[in-house]
Swiss-Prot record:
Keywords: Cell membrane, Cytochrome c-type biogenesis, Disulfide bond, Membrane, Oxidoreductase, Redox-active center, Signal-anchor, Transmembrane, Transmembrane helix
NCBIfam families linked: PRK03147.1 (NF002854)
The protein's name: Thiol-disulfide oxidoreductase ResA
Originating organism: Geobacillus thermodenitrificans (strain NG80-2)
Cell compartments where the protein resides: Cell membrane
Disulphide-bonded residues: C74-C77
Keyword Membrane: yes
Keyword RNA-binding in annotation: no
Topology versus the membrane: Single-pass type II membrane protein
All residue ranges annotated as the Thioredoxin domain in the record: 36-174
GO cellular component entries: plasma membrane
Amino acid sequence: MKKQQRLVMRTVILLLLLAALGYTIYANFFTEKTAVAVGSTAPDFVLSDLEGREHRLTDYRGKGVFLNFWGTWCKPCEREMPYMNELYPIYQKQGVEILAVNVGEPKLNVEKFAERFGLTFPIVIDRQDQVLNAYGVGPLPTTFLIDKNGKVKKIITGTMTKEDIKQHLESIKP
């Protein structure tokens, strides 16, 4: 009886290891991962904002786009949002848009966060992580600076100071 229990346990462990190995191989070789590189055209997407309006990246052609991927739980994201909000009206008048892409959180959480900080720039939610994956985003926050022609000028991972954000917004003015 004891030998039979050991055999069953070994079989279960072996099956779990094989499943983990199979998943690892599948995830690394067969799933589509498109990392965006500096100089490439930013992948187009359509996402809805908190009011239900659709935002298509190509609709922003002719303007610089500060494309920021973030989460409400992300402390570095929380630190840079007020700076982005303060600079948004200044640079919007100069042809630069800030578009904040939340990474798949419930709309209510995002709305509460936006209200708490009084955010005025467009916030869209990537419910299925399709845009996140298309851009190859890893840690948050990650920001893509996109020029007026839709080309990625720079990719920034990690939190930014107000001065950093200002310099980046300056760099993508049309």
